[in-house]
């Protein structure tokens, strides 16, 4: 065996980390980056630099390289592609050996793949567009605490999307008034009400008071309607210890579901809370607050499809995914892509939806896609078409903004939903015939009729900032 000798100095990254003939292994974690290089840095060198700095390379040769097998552990840039319609950047595909990462730790994956490399001077901008997790890695992660089927069985609700509502105003209500708003919405026909992401334990409403009044509302609405109800109690807290304290109290008062802000609260805290929920029979609703800071810039950051995959591995039974038709960012094709990544057991590569790799989830359960943000009854036909049954449609202002109050707003949404589900079963085209379907239902529901009149002119027609670039192999 030849003995390698140490030679100090600086070499080009491409000499070790650009390998266009590499065939990725089934056990590799694959990444697609969008790279905008600095002037004068060629494509292969920039891609190799990203591969090196996100795996085991550094800026100079070090003698300790001889103490390990770099050919095994290094990341490899193996393919480059043009970005359609944008000649300032390109896609770089990088393969990482699975042994670079701690089992079951999406935190460890992120510290390498989206760590210091994102501040690297050789690239002007860098975006992680997609990841392929091999089934060997998926099997080491906890995933959703329960998943879609278990939640439906717990609630005894099948064959339709679930209905929810975020209580407004999001800040400032007392605990008693907050609970009253929940009760009215639940008895009006909703399945869930929800804490907003920034409701924690502020001076105007401490968390324990909110939990008590809300669960009183939930139990009263259940008794009156005969349906299982719930409220997403946000247990996001300043410390993990306080988070678990709130979760334990929610369990004590028999809440069926709690909530966590997984990006603001942190992936480590989220994985721990998901494990707790799994062990304690509690459903876990996930809010994505802070995501747009990370994913909205089309050239730098992390695409939301990656954040969706990370959440599914980390654990959550629900995830906010945008609405397509509401007030929040998200084009239809991309949204359908990450909805599938959240719910399906196998998602094939589909560049028309921005999916760069096949993704096999094995037997890991999926989660409910949550549509929330600027939606009202006129959006119901499109929402049922886009999101399907395994979703939660959350109308905040579209419930509490009803002229006749919360219960009437909830009733209007329930009637609209059931009309759309029935029409779908009859083979009607919901988006083309939506107006006729809702108008016919409103003839027997004054609450829906008033809701349709109230919001008939409300639209959110703004251009999507992060446009889907459809690329071919």
Swiss-Prot record:
Required cofactor(s): Mg(2+)
InterPro entries: RuBisCO, RuBisCo_large_chain_AS, RuBisCO_lsu_C, RuBisCO_lsu_C_sf, RuBisCO_lsu_fd_N, RuBisCO_lsu_N_sf, RuBisCO_lsuI
UniProt superkingdom: Bacteria
Name of the protein this chain belongs to: Ribulose bisphosphate carboxylase large chain 1
Misc: The basic functional RuBisCO is composed of a large chain homodimer in a 'head-to-tail' conformation. In form I RuBisCO this homodimer is arranged in a barrel-like tetramer with the small subunits forming a tetrameric 'cap' on each end of the 'barrel'.
Species for this entry: Nitrobacter winogradskyi (strain ATCC 25391 / DSM 10237 / CIP 104748 / NCIMB 11846 / Nb-255)
Keywords (A to Z) from UniProt: Calvin cycle, Carbon dioxide fixation, Lyase, Magnesium, Metal-binding, Monooxygenase, Oxidoreductase
Gene3D superfamilies in UniProt: Ribulose bisphosphate carboxylase, large subunit, C-terminal domain, RuBisCO large subunit, N-terminal domain
Entry EC number(s): 4.1.1.39
Binding site for Mg(2+): 194, 196-197
PANTHER family in the record: RIBULOSE BISPHOSPHATE CARBOXYLASE, RIBULOSE BISPHOSPHATE CARBOXYLASE LARGE CHAIN
Enzyme class: lyase
N6-carboxylysine, modified sites: 194
Keyword rRNA-binding in annotation: no
Transition state stabilizer, annotated site positions: 327
Binding site for substrate: 116, 166, 170, 288, 320, 372
